């Protein structure tokens, strides 16, 4: 989470980013952006929808947004992202982790319909699709297939040597 020199949280719609987003759009570049944690990050552990999130946030309370009211909440972060997309309609954006709308493909579809230059990847959130109605998810994937990218968010178990290691050996 980024703070400015005054200690204020910097959101995706901060005007200081406008020249960067404008330049990217003008050059036809794509912004790949992680713009928010999963909605589960802002729920009590016992209300989270997937086991992986329950385990992760229970073991890592420093990242559990609900426990940190000083951090802008989920709704504020998503709203800031949406305002940024509205201000930069020609900027191509890939929203990592299903655009942080992993909990509901209908909600994500509304954003994809509203923002034609928005695409999303599946990294680290595909499990959230598995708990939604199969037919609804299948229809969503078919309809938006040209705007959904496969992603892994692959980690190597927090191994400090992973960054310098031969990927083939790490995957063996």
Regions found by a protein language model. Name each.
Residues 11, 68-71:
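Charge-dense, low-complexity intrinsically disordered segments
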Residues 69, 75-83, 88-172:
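H/E-rich (His + Asp/Glu) clusters that bind or coordinate divalent metals
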Residues 1-64, 116-119, 124-126, 134:
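Active-site gating/metal-coordination segments in enzymes
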